[in-house]
A protein has these predicted regions:
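Helix C-cap/helix->beta junction micro-motif
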Residues: 47-48, 78, 165
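Glycine/threonine-rich helix-loop capping motifs at alpha-helix boundaries
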Residues: 117-126, 169
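Conserved glycine-rich beta-strand-loop-beta hairpin in the small C-terminal domain of fold type I
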Residues: 134, 149-159, 170-180
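Active-site PLP attachment segment
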Residues: 74-112
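Active-site phosphate-binding strand-loop segment of PLP-dependent enzymes
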Residues: 2-67
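Amphipathic alpha-helix from the class-I
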Residues: 107, 127-149, 160-166
Length: 180
């Protein structure tokens, strides 16, 4: 299993560190982080004054009964120090639709983020992208469920194939996403 190395994180995080990028669920390892891990990370980042950029683009792709936990939902401290990014591109297979979203619960951090967006000339997404994103989230749930079942079937096929034909290879079953 793969776990966050908090001892190493403590060792490398000095006064120059301002930000931590979290892949939640982890990609490419396919790990759905536990509540305990996220709580510990939130406490660490809040105490160190780090902004957590939580990439949650695979959040709707938890597999085999696993449940994604949004980082900002862990605690008030997590919400106060995080910006969560997501997009419909992975879940709904619409990578050509250039659209993403950011959730910034803390008002002060949100103001800083919006100021950064304006300074770097990041405007609104094209209207077609916004419409496609809304349609995907409103109308795509049945498609998403079928896609997850298909991915789980592919993973089970790979596990079976390896077990029967190349037993030296023991694939790790992902808890989220689509990589084995």
């Amino acid at each position: 299993t793969y776990e966050m190395d908090f001892d190493n994180l403590e060792a490398v995080c000095d006064a120059h560190c301002k930000m931590l990028i979290l892949s939640n669920p982890h990609n490419p390892a396919g790990i759905v982080w536990s509540r305990e891990t996220l709580e510990k990370l939130a406490e660490f980042c809040y105490e160190k004054g780090l902004v957590v950029i939580s990439d949650e683009i695979h959040c709707d792709m938890a597999l085999f009964g696993n449940k994604h936990i949004p980082f900002a939902s862990i605690s008030e401290k997590a919400a106060a120090c995080s910006i969560t990014f997501g997009a419909p591109s992975k879940t709904f297979n619409i990578a050509g639709i250039v659209c993403s979203y950011a959730i910034v619960p803390d008002e002060n951090l949100r103001k800083r983020f919006y100021s950064w967006l304006e300074a770097n000339e990041f405007g609104a997404a094209p209207i077609f992208s916004s419409i496609a994103t809304i349609a995907a989230f409103r109308k795509g749930e049945e498609w998403r469920k079928q896609m997850l079942a298909y991915i789980e079937g592919n993973i089970e096929f790979v596990e079976s194939f390896c077990r029967e034909r190349i037993p030296q290879v023991k694939p790790l079953r992902p808890q989220a996403s689509f990589l084995v």
